[in-house]
Swiss-Prot record:
SMART domains with a match to the protein in the record: GRAM (SM00568), PH (SM00233)
Sequence ranges assigned to domain GRAM in this UniProt record: 240-284, 765-870
Record EC number: 2.4.1.-, 2.4.1.173
Family designation: Belongs to the glycosyltransferase 28 family.
Main enzyme class: transferase
Coiled-coil residues: 883-910
Protein name as catalogued: Sterol 3-beta-glucosyltransferase ATG26
The PH domain, residue ranges: 289-385
Protein keywords: Autophagy, Coiled coil, Cytoplasm, Glycosyltransferase, Membrane, Protein transport, Repeat, Transferase, Transport
SUPFAM superfamilies the UniProt entry points to: PH domain-like (SSF50729), UDP-Glycosyltransferase/glycogen phosphorylase (SSF53756)
Role according to the record: Sterol glycosyltransferase responsible for the glycosylation of ergosterol to form ergosterol-glucoside.
Annotated source species: Gibberella zeae (strain ATCC MYA-4620 / CBS 123657 / FGSC 9075 / NRRL 31084 / PH-1) (Wheat head blight fungus)
Length: 1443
């Protein structure tokens, strides 16, 4: 044995002097040699000799340790102590790592030696053991003291250095059978001063003895640190020190790609250094994007039946809705920050059912298929895993001295897995288990870890760590010993000190998803399960937001990077101040044995009596205050000063929380607090006598405070309830954004604190109601009603980022969560009910919402608050100031940069370790969910292999033709052969761009006159068109078919009416494209049926149903006749054509007309198709350039006024009104008089035209000019509101005035007003037009909005997007035309009601009639369109009345 000990000591010395990395590689080589030359012993020789050795080596000591001067009084010790002695510093024992740093030149002498008898035969054995602390009578007589903390190396005491414990016993005492006790030594300089009392020196020796793990182990860490300072530090070592916040540079021994195995499999890298085992993985959070969405069935809380909802997994919240379009009205929410697990139900053979367990309840779901259920479970597991991690990267740092053992486990069949059991810290001695899987280098990595643990100076068995038993420290720790030690009673906790704690951003969890609450214990600690771990651990900014009395008390340690510190202390996260919030240490009574029940007081959902009374000072353990100045105080902003990890650990009656996976704090005062020793000093022990007086004072204070609270409670409890109900029905409001920093009255601190507590309660309830993050700041609350079918009374919440509503009627659960960024505008209108005041909120891509208030002041205050917050958010976005989402993006970018730097440093040092992905997991049904960096996925190529002959069919004015010219030029660039089929007057313009032209009959001017005079598709329009336009429609259909022959793809404006039939005849794919909404939606009304006021989603949807039926019924007879005679196709109907399933391309910007949420996947909003004609050969006239230059020199605003080729009754009058308005508004005008070029047929052509007004010098008249050039030279534009002209002015970033005449012009004028970038002039006149000119040229708010919108539109590429959409939906369009061709080739004897392919529409909402019923009624009631009757007013000027 002695020879073995000598060899071990020599080997350890060689490790210290040499390189640790080389030693590990040498040990690996020995293992390989042993494997190759291993001797197989026969069966009788395989038994262990452990029993004999135990009987021989581990005999009991002959005598217990002896102490001197046991009769000395403690008060005598105090009297003998010098005033200059600081007992706090004197009893702060140094760690074993510090002993080697003392000066070697200082002579020391032995003060006292205590001999310990040893059994015979052990005299020459140099392997010494620690004595059992339970045998020391002095320590057994003292209370259960907290563990001793080591002081940081940088802290130097002003007193002489304390006595050091000798590392090795003197050899001359070996023969006598006595083992020399640790020698208490002092320097010669110290002996000149007065010595400390004997008991003081003895207690110091005991403290140092408890710190040292073993006397025969050398100080590897200190040697490494000294060598690392002298040698050159590698880039990887520097980066690891920065990321994991080491105290010093550490030598990197090995690096391996590995996977952290928990409920998911996380890709990362393991870094093995001289002192730590580190794991790093880049895991970005996806807070602002929807991860998965789809339909699921959910079981109710009390109703076991399943109901079908549409689910969306976004951020940390799983939200479900009644329909996929009501994304602002959630039916329910599941906050996955409280999530524990997600798993498939084992008893389900079909694997359709799965459950999600949270701290509150268990949710049951049913998917449509087994793959869908599996995908949902994996997505939920990923989100739960991410939500439990702090930051955008996973960091785990395991000190090697804390590692108990490393065990090979077979968790998954396709990788090597090891289990690392590590002691969390020296406060609770909780044992964590971490599982790491290796798909490559697995055996090598596990061997390196085992070698490093066995050779480390901190290698101790679990029994030594927990109980301090006297076992041979040279024995390697085994799994059997660890398991036996873990079952030890916690009453044997020693005062030993671990040099470091486990630090992690992620909690250690079981590698298997728990199936029941009894299996939720992630680690085995002592002898009791720790089932409360997952539910109550604190995880930083995305952590479990448990009650303040539980979640905030956990001394969990996390990496103190920029992410964790920036989100832990936000506004509104404070808790009521308690006495134990200060930096006071607590001393347990000697009769109180620590147990697991006290370590985890939050293990149960129902609070115990001690938890209820935790706010009382009476029920706390005795408190030892360092000084009055160290107490923490609450600052005026409602935040608390950051506390050190020890302060966190001392909460809950001095017992730290069970979950204590350690934290890293920045160096400074916080570290000084955390490094203070937990072992009570002699100075502190003297204060024990004052505890009864402190308890009495605290009890008296408690009685006084409680009596006052109870008295006020009885007096105000019932009154407060009445006031709440009265305030709710009275409809009051409250603002919560008053800065607390303005309060300067210190006398009112208690009043302010009480008000702040009430305010904080309201804010917490607001966040809990809507599952919002802690960063959401409540601004104001109101009471009012949301108006859907019936008014629903409730409470409005306005935060800095959301507008929320919650119904208060019993039996209702309506909620609204509307992000402020989705609100386009807010309008004040009349209420639907008498005596109420309305507020309309216009939402991007959604129908407008209506609200009502009892008082106009409340309505106005709510509108102003919303406008202010909307403007603030827009200003922050424009100015570049980071909002919350951008802050998260910046943190994610920082984490990505950190990952890249670490990868670069890793590749420089370990180039042979490349990551090997588990390629066989796809075939394993129960393989864990895999998380890894998202690679850059390349998109699929949808472009056809050969060029196509594409025809664009359209009719209308110049603005209707121009977008198709732009699209055809893009198709030409793609190699296709485009053709435009339209009116003959545009032939020269089309061919000038190199595009083939095909003629379509029809006069666009005649059609425009019909629309202006009768309104767009009104009863008068249909009656006149039915009588006079029969021949016009026949010519249009025949010429359109001729123009489209030979085409391989047809793109048509739906106003041409012939395209869908031609595509059916030619059996070619068919697309629709238009400049205004033509597809059924609740977001916008039909562009041809625009009301004067907002009418809601039900009305909007019904306008499309009405128009489709009227439009088809008016043309059905001629169309079916043309199909039969010309095309040879059978007659059709609106239901058989299914026009709403045709792929659609909208050529307007999504920034102007946001895609509605209820659009199908084949409906695309591509962006404007601009035809840039100003950048070619066109040159502006010199007169125009001079006019613009003179206006700029005079400091005048320049506006453009042009209403295109609109036909007006009195062109001269309109010109004079424009002149007068320009002069009144004091602006310069560029006038394009296109309205005088066309003459109304009602006027006599033989009459001479009226005299034109005299044009003043402030106005310059032009014939035409490219919009892309002209609009960039002016300040505002006024036009008729066509799609192309509106897009041109908005792209230039200038405010727009729209004077609508017919068609889609009313729609775009409404959109311009809703966006706040222009003015709509519905009632024309000199004064109204002049006021509009004044506003658009001087309203800075409107000017800024227009400029921002212009930047967004200019960044789009509408033509390129449209071409890609054509490629993407081409196969879908072919499938539709094949289906129609198959039906036409079938026998004509099919039943008329054959609905195999009939379109099935889900009508969104419950507040509108069935569209199918309306379609049939309209079809039956429109038989006599040509009947005589009074002509109704145009629908473009007023809202129609719908029965």
């Amino acid at each position: 044995m002695a020879t073995q000990a000598d060899d071990a000591a020599a080997s350890q010395a060689n490790i210290e002097d040499g390189d640790l990395k080389e030693h590990v590689h040498d040990e690996l080589d020995k293992i390989q040699q042993q494997r190759s030359t291993a001797t197989v012993f026969p069966e009788p020789l395989r038994e262990s000799d452990s029993e004999d050795s135990d009987d021989e080596d581990n005999g009991p000591a002959q005598a217990p340790p002896m102490f001197m001067n046991m009769n000395q009084s403690i008060y005598g010790l105090i009297a003998q102590a010098s005033n200059r002695v600081d007992f706090n510093d004197r009893f702060d024992g140094m760690s074993s790592d510090e002993e080697g740093e003392s000066s070697q030149n200082t002579r020391t002498e032995s003060i006292a030696r205590t001999s310990i008898l040893q059994p015979a035969g052990k005299g020459k054995d140099k392997v010494h053991r620690r004595r059992k602390l339970s045998e020391h009578k002095l320590l057994r007589s003292l209370p259960a003291l907290p563990k001793l903390r080591s002081r940081h190396k940088s802290q130097h005491s002003t007193l002489p250095a304390p006595e050091e414990v000798a590392d090795e016993a003197d050899d001359e005492h070996g023969d006598g059978g006595l083992l020399p006790a640790p020698a208490l030594t002092l320097t010669r300089q110290d002996t000149q001063d007065r010595l400390a009392p004997v008991m003081s020196r003895m207690l110091e020796a005991k403290a140092d003895l408890s710190i040292r793990p073993s006397f025969d182990l050398d100080r590897l860490s200190s040697d490494v640190s000294r060598s690392s300072d002298s040698d050159e530090v590698s880039a990887l070592s520097r980066k690891l020190k920065e990321i994991f916040e080491f105290d010093e540079y550490e030598q990197v021994i090995e690096e391996y790609p590995c996977w952290l195995l928990q409920s998911v499999l996380l890709q990362g890298y393991m870094y093995i250094t001289s002192k730590h085992i580190c794991f790093y993985a880049y895991l970005p959070k996806k807070t602002h994007e929807a991860v998965k969405s789809g339909y699921l069935s959910k079981s109710g809380k009390r109703n076991p039946s399943y109901a079908r909802f549409w689910f969306r997994l976004k951020g940390d919240v799983l939200t479900y809705y009644k329909t996929a379009t009501d994304v602002y009205f959630p039916h329910g929410q599941i906050d996955l920050r409280y999530g524990i697990s997600a798993s498939i139900v084992d008893t389900d053979k079909e694997a359709l059912h799965f459950v999600v367990e949270t701290r509150h309840r268990t949710y049951k779901f049913k998917a449509d298929s087994a793959p869908s259920a599996k995908e949902w479970v994996k997505s939920l597991q990923r989100v739960i895993f991410r939500s439990h991690n702090d930051g955008d990267s996973v960091k785990i740092s395991l000190p090697i001295k804390n590692v108990m053992d490393i065990e090979d486990t077979q968790m998954i069949s396709f990788a090597d897995t090891c289990k690392i059991r590590v002691i969390d810290n020296d406060e609770t001695y909780a044992i964590d288990e971490y599982f790491f899987s290796f798909f490559s280098f697995g055996k090598e990595a596990i061997n390196v870890l085992k070698i490093l643990i066995e050779d480390s100076s901190g290698a101790r068995s679990a029994e030594q760590v927990i109980t301090g038993d006297d076992h041979d420290s040279s024995q390697p720790s085994s799994g059997h010993a660890s398991k036996a030690a873990s079952k030890r009673a916690p009453s044997k906790l020693s005062t030993g000190k671990l040099p470091d704690t486990v630090k992690a951003t992620l909690a250690p969890m079981s590698p298997l998803s728990p199936r029941s609450p009894s299996q939720l214990s992630p680690r085995a600690s002592m002898d009791a399960p720790r089932s409360s771990f997952d539910g109550f651990r604190r995880f930083g900014k995305k952590s479990l937001d448990v009650t303040s009395s539980i979640g905030d008390h956990s001394p969990r340690r996390s990496f103190s990077g920029r992410r964790s510190t920036s989100h832990q202390h936000r506004q509104g996260t404070t808790t009521p101040k308690q006495a134990h919030d200060s930096e006071d240490s607590f001393l347990q009574s000697s009769i109180e044995n620590p147990s697991i029940s006290t370590l985890s007081p939050s293990s149960y959902d129902e609070p115990s009596a001690s938890q209820i009374l935790q706010g009382s000072d009476v029920f706390h353990s005795p408190m030892m205050r360092r000084s009055a100045s160290t107490s923490r105080k609450r600052d005026r902003s409602g935040k608390r000063t950051p506390r050190s990890s020890s302060a966190h650990g001392d909460r809950h009656h001095g017992i730290p929380h069970a979950a204590t996976t350690g934290a890293i704090h920045k160096m400074g005062d916080e570290q000084a607090d955390s490094q203070r020793p937990a072992t009570p000093t002699l100075n502190s022990i003297t204060k024990i006598g004052a505890y009864p007086l402190q308890r009495a004072n605290a009890f008296a204070e408690y009685l006084s405070r409680t009596s006052q609270r109870m008295g006020s409670m009885f007096a105000t409890e019932s009154l407060g309830y009445v006031e709440k109900v009265h305030g709710m029905w009275k409809g009051e409001h409250r603002h919560y954004d008053e800065p607390q920093e303005l309060r300067t009255d210190d006398d009112g601190e208690d009043i302010d604190s009480e008000a702040d507590d009430k305010m904080q309660t309201t804010i917490d309830r607001f966040r809990a109601h809507f599952a919002l993050p802690e960063s959401e700041k409540l601004v104001a609350t109101y009471f009012g009603a949301i108006f859907k079918v019936l008014p629903l009374y409730g409470k409005f919440y306005i935060s800095d980022r959301s507008f929320c509503f919650r119904s208060l009627y019993p039996g209702t659960r309506t909620k609204l969560i509307l992000p402020l960024k989705d609100i386009e505008n807010v309008h004040k209108e009349k209420g639907f009910r008498y005596g109420y005041y309305g507020l309309t909120v216009v939402i991007r891509g959604h129908e407008e919402l209506f609200f009502e208030f009892r008082k106009p002041g409340l309505r106005d205050d709510c509108a102003v608050t919303l406008h202010q917050l909307m403007e603030t958010n827009r200003f922050l976005e424009q100015s570049g100031i980071l909002d919350q989402e951008e802050q998260d993006d910046e943190e994610a970018a920082a984490a990505m940069a950190e990952r890249d730097e670490l990868q670069e440093a890793r590749q420089d040092e370990f180039v042979d370790h490349e990551l090997t992905l588990p390629r066989t997991t796809s075939g394993v049904s129960n393989a864990p969910t895999i998380l890894f960096d998202n690679p850059n996925s390349s998109g699929l190529a949808f472009k056809p292999q050969k060029s196509m002959k594409i025809t664009c069919l359209t009719i209308g004015s110049r603005g209707d033709i121009q977008p198709y010219i732009a699209l055809c030029k893009g198709l030409l660039a793609e190699g296709h052969k485009p053709r435009i089929a339209t009116h003959g007057e545009f032939q020269e313009w089309v061919e000038s761009h190199g595009i083939e032209f095909a003629r379509v009959e029809g006069d666009p001017g005649e059609l425009m006159r019909l629309c202006i005079e009768n309104g767009t598709f009104t009863w008068a329009f249909l009656r006149e068109a039915n009588s006079t336009f029969r021949g016009w429609l026949d010519d249009l259909l025949d010429s359109a078919y001729t123009a489209c022959e030979g085409s391989e793809l047809l793109i048509e404006s739906p106003s041409a009416m012939a395209g869908i039939h031609i595509a059916e005849k030619l059996e070619i794919p068919y697309f629709r494209a238009f400049t205004m909404p033509w597809t059924r939606t609740r977001a916008y009304p039909h562009a041809f049926i625009m009301p004067e006021h907002k009418m809601g989603g039900a009305f909007n949807y019904m306008t499309y149903v009405m128009f489709d039926n009227i439009f088809w019924k008016a043309t059905a007879y001629q169309v079916n006749r043309w199909r039969n005679k010309t095309l040879g196709l059978p007659s059709t109907s609106l239901e058989k054509m299914q026009p709403n399933k045709v792929p659609f391309l909208y050529n307007f910007s999504p920034s102007v007309v946001a895609p509605p949420l209820d659009f199908s996947d084949w409906i695309r909003v591509t962006g404007y198709w601009f035809l840039n004609e100003g950048g070619g050969d066109w040159k502006p006239p010199q007169e125009l350039q001079d006019f613009i230059a003179k206006a700029r020199a005079d400091g005048k605003k320049i506006v453009y006024v042009g209403f295109g080729s609109i036909i007006v009754k009195d062109p001269a009058k309109m010109t004079q009104e424009v002149i007068d308005a320009v002069l009144k508004a004091d602006v310069r005008c560029i006038l394009s008089k296109g309205w005088s070029d066309r003459i109304s047929p009602k006027d006599d052509p033989s009459k001479p035209p009226p005299d034109e007004p005299v044009i003043p010098a402030e106005i310059h008249v032009i014939t035409s000019a490219p919009h892309d050039w002209l609009f960039s030279q002016i300040d505002a534009a006024a036009h008729h509101g066509g799609s192309g002209t509106t897009g041109a002015s908005l792209r230039a970033g200038i405010p727009t005035i729209i004077r609508p005449f017919f068609g889609d012009q009313f729609f775009f004028s409404t959109r311009v007003e809703d966006l706040g970038v222009g003015v709509c002039v519905r009632k024309w006149g000199t004064n109204s037009f002049g006021r509009a000119l004044w506003e658009v040229t001087r309203n800075e708010r409107m000017i800024v909005k227009a400029r921002v919108l212009g930047e967004q539109i200019r960044s789009e590429s509408g033509v390129d997007n449209a071409i890609q959409c054509i490629y993407r939906d081409l196969e879908y369009a072919k499938s539709l035309i094949k289906r129609r061709a198959g039906k036409n080739n079938a026998e004509h004897g099919l039943a008329e009601d054959d609905d195999d392919t009939e379109e099935s529409w889900t009508f969104v909402g419950r507040d509108e009639p069935d569209p199918d019923a309306v379609t049939k009624k309209l079809s039956d009631g429109l038989a006599g369109l040509g009947a005589a009757g009074d002509r109704p007013p145009p629908l473009g000027s007023q809202a129609p009345t719908v029965a």
